[in-house]
Amino acid sequence: MGNCLYPVETLSLDKNGTQFTFDSWNYSFEDNYSYELSSDYSLTPAAPCYSCNLLDRSSLPFFMLTSVLGMLASGSILFAILRPFFHWQICPSWPILAELAVGSALFSIAVPILAPGLHSAHSTALCNLGYWVWYTSAFAQALLIGCYACLNPRLNIGQLRGFTLGLSVGLWGAAALSGLPVALASDVYNGFCTFPSSRDMEALKYTHYAICFTIFTVLPLTLLAAKGLKIALSKGPGPWVSVLWIWFIFWWPHGMVLIFDALVRSKTVLLYTCQSQKILDAMLNVTEALSMLHCVATPLLLALFCHQTTRRSLSSLSLPTRQASQMDALAGKS
């Protein structure tokens, strides 16, 4: 919206008259030329509205710290899942968990590319690649969590290796295609990787906003509604609720604010005050920062999910199985 360090000089009208001058704008007119108005108008609403970008160059430490913590956490949980002595039988959902860890790691790698203040990294190609990896990894994680919640109660997809592989390829392919609009619409402007104002790119930007709203906002609401209906109608368990659903808390506001911003840009929703526009710009920055934190939280959610699944699997061992193991031990001693 502009540079918040240099607010605009607003014009004021004398309430007792109908004249205003441009002396404060350093315009020199011969004989101090003035304009006559037929009525008392206020020019303040016509002044440009300048908003402060919260994610400017001063936020570079936040970007870098989030990236480092995300890569360390994602790498640690991925190593724990893929190590040879991991309890794959006790936690059969490990392929999905590994993909979520990979998605979180990819997002963490993309964060420095889009970090403000790193001018050396701000080439157009890197900007496009950064946004593509950023949103492709996020879309893939959302789709994996949603499909896992819907299909696992019926199919136990962790046990079906071929089905899991095909599902993963399809979901990652859909996520990669969904990330193309934002990659094509992004560019470098004044040292920042952003979406430049261009009518040629508006279709791509609106497509991206719609995809984000559908995946980040509509998908979790659909899961909650389906779960509620299944419980209310007593027609089966419905989507499997797990700690992984917390992931959507980091992205749900981002989808909501993006679609609202799209409505404002398309003049479908009108903001009549500069303060409203400033609040919207601030919310765009806040929700983007919140979504970035998911790369740190996701590995923790995966670790908690593995812990809960392991405890559930161990407690589900039948008593006859335990007794049989004890009898085998006694027979070996005799």
Swiss-Prot record:
Phenotype when changing residue 268 to I: In strain: BLG2/Msf, C57BL/10SnJ, HMI/Msf, MSM/Msf, NJL/Msf and SWN/Msf
Phenotype of gene-disrupted mutants: (Microbial infection) Gene knockout results in reduced parasitemia after infection with Plasmodium yoelii parasites. Increased resistance of mature erythrocytes to P.yoelii infection. No significant effects on reticulocyte resistance to P.yoelii infection.
Topology class, membrane: Multi-pass membrane protein
Coarse class of the protein's main subcellular location: other
GO MF: chemokine binding; G protein-coupled receptor activity
Listed GO CC annotations: early endosome; membrane; recycling endosome
Glycosylation positions in this chain: 16, 26, 32, 285
Matches recorded under Gene3D superfamilies: Rhodopsin 7-helix transmembrane proteins (1.20.1070.10)
Protein name: Atypical chemokine receptor 1
Source organism per UniProt: Mus musculus
Gene field: Ackr1
